[in-house]
UniProtKB/Swiss-Prot annotation:
Protein name: Sodium channel regulatory subunit beta-2
SMART domains: IG (SM00409)
Species assigned in the record: Mus musculus (Mouse)
Extracellular face of the membrane: 30-157
Region (Disordered): 188-215
Amino acid sequence: MHRDAWLPRPAFSLTGLSLFFSLVPPGRSMEVTAPTTLSVLNGSDTRLPCTFNSCYTVNHKQFSLNWTYQECNNCTEEMFLQFRMKIINLKLERFGDRVEFSGNPSKYDVSVTLKNVQLEDEGIYNCYITNPPDRHRGHGKIYLQVLLEVPPERDSTVAVIVGASVGGFLAVVILVLMVVKCVRRKKEQKLSTDDLKTEEEGKMDGEGNAEDGTK
């Protein structure tokens, strides 16, 4: 037999390597936390919160972050801030100098602050996070709604009045029932006492008559 027959064929070797890597457990993916919707008043400053949980500490040499904006779900995303060893503010024309990084990657916080919010800022804000050796990229999505005025608070005066009236009525009813119960109990006790006295007086009269008959 030729000695080369004992050597593994390349195809078998590649198959073995593929099987080996398929058995290696993948890195656990990170979890990103961000509000689904954020309503802010026109002209105010707002913080776009985005935090993440990772099984690994942040290595600034490998960690990366992208913040993007899009007007609608199907619209093109525009990157306005990123982290590559340091924070890089791309200063899009729509935002200018109004975007400020307010997070701390070492504390798993990559939030940004948007100053002097305008109506044109309404839309979708995405934060994309990569933290090797986590293999999967984390994604947080926030829909920013810009309001012209603060929505009016619901008037709860009527509810308070109704609740107080019902509570007062129930208190009066309970008080009346307690008074009636006390009065009835006192009457029952008085009747029991009177019956007991009558019974004792009858016994005493019977004993007196018996003594008179003996004499």
